[in-house]
Amino acid sequence: DAQEILSKAKAIADEQGVEATTLIVTGDPASVFVELSRNYNLIVIGNRGKGGLAERLLGTTSSSLPAYAYCPIVVVPYTDDDGNLMHLNNTITKVAVGSDESKWGLKALEIAANFAAAWDAELDVISAVPNMKGSDDEGVMASFKDDLEVRIKPLEEAHPDLKINKQIVPGPAVGALTKASYDHDVVVVGSRGRGGFTGLLLGSTSQGLLQHAVGPVYVVPRKYVEAAETRLDTVPSSPAEVKPKALDDIKGVEEVPVSKAEPDVVEAIETKIDPDRQ
């Protein structure tokens, strides 16, 4: 089965002009992928809901790949909560980002703005006001709005032509961003692994944003951000300086050559992914 899956994936990559290396991972996939993330700028996970690789990689906040990876992670849903096949856009016109004052949230904001600018897309910045005593007070809401303006100002200066919409929403961050996934092409979030706006996004496999979003979620992990800001000897000074790890040194990874799937198989897969493709 693994060989067949890799064969199809390689054929699709070849069709798009992308050089692909095929690997088989054994053992605990989350641990292996964390080590593999040292070697890549981005990891993409297809999520088909309950069961399968994605559920083992996402896990809980304490064990998930997005919480501990060295590079950003994109989680792409295959079906919605009811098992219906998702149809994702091939173009990006609207980007949403969850924003708070943490360094993880600020990095997610920066990445989302660069992403939206590159695609000439709109950027919706969402700041959630937690349910707590006095949270509906006008002064509290005004404070959140002022804080959001401060965070957005550098983006407006860096991207003067970028259309930025600001939203202050009451209630849990998870609900606000899950809702945003219905009418945005991608949702960008930061992850520090626990607590705060970003920590709530992972949660358990039954409650987290990553399990209920109906569109791609781009996660900016804690280690990626910390590597970008620190000058300590124990942590590289930028994500680009995270030392890669040779495949031979990563237990549970084997590079395997595979034959390319037949053209009709590739066409059937691509048609299933995008029924409107020409």
Language-model segments: residues:
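Short, solvent-exposed amphipathic alpha-helices that sit
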Residues: 1-9, 32, 111, 143-151
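Phosphate/nucleotide-donor binding subsite
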Residues: 3-23
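Small/aliphatic-rich secondary-structure junction motif
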Residues: 16, 91-138, 156-158, 163-167, ...
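A structural preference for short, hydrophobic beta-strand core positions in alpha/beta folds
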Residues: 22-24, 75, 125, 166-168, ...
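Charged docking surfaces used in two-component/phosphorelay signaling
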Residues: 24-32, 168-174
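Gly/Ser-rich helix-loop-strand patches that form or flank binding pockets
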Residues: 30, 35-84, 181-228
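Short, well-ordered secondary-structure micro-motifs
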Residues: 85-87, 108-109, 135-139, 176-179, ...
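Glycine/small-residue-rich hydrophobic helix-like segments
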Residues: 136-194, 198
